[in-house]
């Protein structure tokens, strides 16, 4: 037999009795079993191919370059609140969306020519009982509360599920819940004139949700007085930092003690909010991260598209094959490139944040300056990439073990 052919012995069970002999296993059964094993083996090999990235040196260089470029954009065009060219753009975008929302809610679909008039209309249209500012109203009972921080301290002003929960609770019970100095504070009978619209529970829930969302829209670009004065105003807290309020509120409701770490993180989040780190600035931070994502996927698709047209004969070309070779979404190669790109982005951004924190602190580390400049969106996206890499590495090891287990071993 030719040496080029791999052979495997097939053993058939043979039974012998007085009348003769018989095979317990037919050749057809053995072949069927072998074919089934081959299918499993091919599927395992295919799984390994789908889990292993096929990046070349240029892929890594281009991915790292994209991350470095977007990191530089983040340093000079995003920076920190109050010194952000991209932040000015996102501020204006939110202001325009606020005016669009006010027009949508107006009975006559009135065009608002200024932000302060739109905010004035929305503040009047979406009244809530938890809008104390600490300026002469019930909010003065909350220590340290003022017009600059009440959007953060007020749980119902948080754009999160817990914020929605406390908004509904406050509207039903005419209360206000705040976080101050690591404590959950509840104000009873917060507004003597308050009455939630709706004739039954479902309609009240709907009205409560609409009030919550509408009131957030009236606050996302600051107050009408700040807009009238030409100031940026205090927006609503970043969804990525309201968790510091959530932890304290949940622990208070469960009767658990609030740790010093919880208080320190909450105070840090409050301090950066007072310096302008709100939803608008968080959106500005997302732009270079999104650009990095877009560039890497585009680079991958263009390189594979060029390779497809240069290596695939015309008679074999098809849209289905081209998409399989070039799609920049589900394959491990582009995911590895994204990990490199976002890792490089975070390295550049964090290096700048650390340097500026040391400079502003006069040699000591200024934590607030560091957090203001650290792109949390980029860190979160990099963490997602690392999670995916870890998951694929575990799956790859498992698939490789299965391949070794199912592969036929040569017999003597």
Where are these regions (language model features)?
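Glycine-rich, hydrophobic membrane-spanning regions of integral membrane proteins that mediate transport
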Residues: 1-407, 411
């Amino acid at each position: 037999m030719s040496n080029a052919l791999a052979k495997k012995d097939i053993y058939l069970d043979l039974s012998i009795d007085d009348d003769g002999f018989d095979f317990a296993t037919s050749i057809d059964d053995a072949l069927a079993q072998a074919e089934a094993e081959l299918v499993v083996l091919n599927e395992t090999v295919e799984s390994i191919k789908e889990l292993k990235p096929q990046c070349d040196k240029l892929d890594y260089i281009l991915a790292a370059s994209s991350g470095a470029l977007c990191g530089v954009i983040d340093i000079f065009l995003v920076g920190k609140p109050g010194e952000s060219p991209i932040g000015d753009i996102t501020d204006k975008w939110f202001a325009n969306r606020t005016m669009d929302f006010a027009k949508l809610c107006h009975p006559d679909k009135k065009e608002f020519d200024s932000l302060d008039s739109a905010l004035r209309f929305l503040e009047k249209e979406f009244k809530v009982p938890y809008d104390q500012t600490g300026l002469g109203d019930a909010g003065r009972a909350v220590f340290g509360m003022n017009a600059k921080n009440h959007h953060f301290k007020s749980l119902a002003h948080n754009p999160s599920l817990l914020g929605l929960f406390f908004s509904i609770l406050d509207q039903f019970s005419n209360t206000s819940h705040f976080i101050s100095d690591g404590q959950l504070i509840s104000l009873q009978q917060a507004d003597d004139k308050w009455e939630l619209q709706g004739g039954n529970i479902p309609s009240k829930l709907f009205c409560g949700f609409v009030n919550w969302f509408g009131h957030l829209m009236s606050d996302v670009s600051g107050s009408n007085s700040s807009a009238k004065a030409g100031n940026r105003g205090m927006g609503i807290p970043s969804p990525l930092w309201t968790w510091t309020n959530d932890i304290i509120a949940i622990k208070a409701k469960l009767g658990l003690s609030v740790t010093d770490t919880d208080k320190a993180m909450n105070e840090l989040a409050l301090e950066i909010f007072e310096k302008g780190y709100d939803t608008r600035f968080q959106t500005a931070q997302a732009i270079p991260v999104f650009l990095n994502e877009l560039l890497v996927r585009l680079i991958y698709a263009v390189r594979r598209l060029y390779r497809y047209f240069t290596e695939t004969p015309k008679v074999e070309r098809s849209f289905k094959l081209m998409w399989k070779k070039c799609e920049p979404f589900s394959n491990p190669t582009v995911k590895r490139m994204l990990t490199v790109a976002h890792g490089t982005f975070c390295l550049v951004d964090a290096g700048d944040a650390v340097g500026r924190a040391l400079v502003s602190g006069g040699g000591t580390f200024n934590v607030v300056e560091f957090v203001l400049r650290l792109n949390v969106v980029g860190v979160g996206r990099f963490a997602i990439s690392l999670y995916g890499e870890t998951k694929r590495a575990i799956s790859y090891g498992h698939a490789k073990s299965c391949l070794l287990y199912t592969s036929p071993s040569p017999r003597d």
